[in-house]
């Protein structure tokens, strides 16, 4: 049975630490049917953040390295910095934090790069507190940080990084969704940039009630299918009739990539987060791996190189490294 996570449980910390380092993975948000609600992490790609406790009562970013360096060094304009500013303000901390961010996730890729930096920073900073705070409190500060990147508080990229696996994320709580261990995800990132704000602008305008009914039906089918380990239910529901039609025209090669995944027995395929990355679900790792070349070939057909990852849907959460 799916249960709501205990949002009051604090993450243990070693007292007296002055520096900590944490890793947070990339993630797939929306998952076709749960816009701003559903997400899951990816194994093997993510961001690492080193946080130092400093005497000055400020948050400052000392360095940003890796795949993406064109990010704000001003703490209030950076998701990781803003999250720690929120944490400091809430706890009235007399000390501050200095961050170094090592990016492993491409900018505006639809793979939750801003969320990964944000959560990694919070996990590391929490280890430096004399009394660590709960997962629920960290989540609220992460929502404040993520709002810097997207303009609104939404947790679909954040919740999975705190819990691991598929998570339903409201603004108040995180609910883990059981998924069969054998099910895997293929994520393909074409070497193109689609800014989150532009992707959200594409969603402006009116929607028909029938579209909401269809999307609600699909969400229910996917959740029921996951709960029952019923691939046929998931296959019937893993379709986005609300958001994908408005964003797909912004992604060159998307239609071909989606069709390639479905032709290789995907349970469903859609846009990862705001795009341009594409995700697909499969019943086995072998099936996901077999589909990867065809999906990448679809992007190559429109002149785009790409990277592909095959990971369990039940991939692990962010973790403290040192």
Curated annotation (Swiss-Prot):
Function statement: Catalyzes the ATP-dependent phosphorylation of L-homoserine to L-homoserine phosphate.
Keyword Amino-acid biosynthesis: yes
Gene Ontology biological process: threonine biosynthetic process
UniProt pathway: Amino-acid biosynthesis; L-threonine biosynthesis; L-threonine from L-aspartate: step 4/5
InterPro entries (alphabetical): GHMP_kinase_C_dom, GHMP_kinase_C_sf, GHMP_kinase_N_dom, Homoserine_kinase, Ribosomal_Su5_D2-typ_SF, Ribsml_uS5_D2-typ_fold_subgr
Protein known as: Homoserine kinase
Reactions it catalyzes: L-homoserine + ATP = O-phospho-L-homoserine + ADP + H(+)
Pfam families listed in its UniProt record: GHMP_kinases_C, GHMP_kinases_N
Alphabetic keyword roster: Amino-acid biosynthesis, ATP-binding, Cytoplasm, Kinase, Nucleotide-binding, Threonine biosynthesis, Transferase
EC number: 2.7.1.39
UniProt family annotation: Belongs to the GHMP kinase family. Homoserine kinase subfamily.
HAMAP family, per database record: Homoser_kinase (MF_00384)
GO molecular function: ATP binding; homoserine kinase activity
Subcellular locations according to the entry: Cytoplasm
Entry GO CC: cytoplasm
Organism (species): Xanthomonas campestris pv. campestris (strain 8004)
Binding site for ATP: 106-116
